[in-house]
Every structure is written in C-alpha cells, then in structure tokens.
C-alpha cells in the first residue's frame, strides 16, 4: 500500500464543502480542516503509486474550489 498526506488549499468559503466531498472518497482514511497556508490535510492510501497519482490528479484536484495541493509520500 502507498500512503500519502495531501495538503490542500481551497478557494475562500469552499473549505467545508471541499472537506465533505473529500471524505466521500474511499481512499481517504482521514481528513481535517487546518489553519495556515493549507486548509485541509488528507491521509490517502492506494494500492500503488500509479493509482495514488491518478486519484490525486483526477479526483482530489478536480474538485471545484481546489486551488493547490502538496503531496507528501509516507516512506
């Protein structure tokens, strides 16, 4: 299994909606609102790196109101 933390920056006012959408994804193990540069921290787990990349690019980053993400792979 490949695990990563994804730090997500949302458009102002869309943080709560984005958090609810993110929590619906099966690969999301945990997700929390935060204060600071990033609005949400997400723990994701996928079968391999290819699937993780696909999920981040084609699901998480495609949510309306997502401005930027930073992915930190767990070693």
PLM features per residue range, with description:
Residues 1-75:
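A compositional/biophysical signature of low hydrophobicity enriched in polar/charged and small residues
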């Amino acid at each position: 299994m490949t695990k990563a933390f994804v730090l997500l920056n949302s458009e102002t006012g869309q943080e709560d909606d984005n958090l609810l959408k993110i929590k619906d994804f099966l690969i999301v193990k945990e997700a929390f609102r935060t204060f600071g540069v990033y609005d949400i921290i997400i723990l994701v787990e996928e079968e391999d790196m290819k699937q993780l990349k696909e999920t981040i690019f084609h699901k998480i980053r495609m949510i309306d109101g997502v401005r930027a993400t930073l992915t930190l792979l767990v070693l």
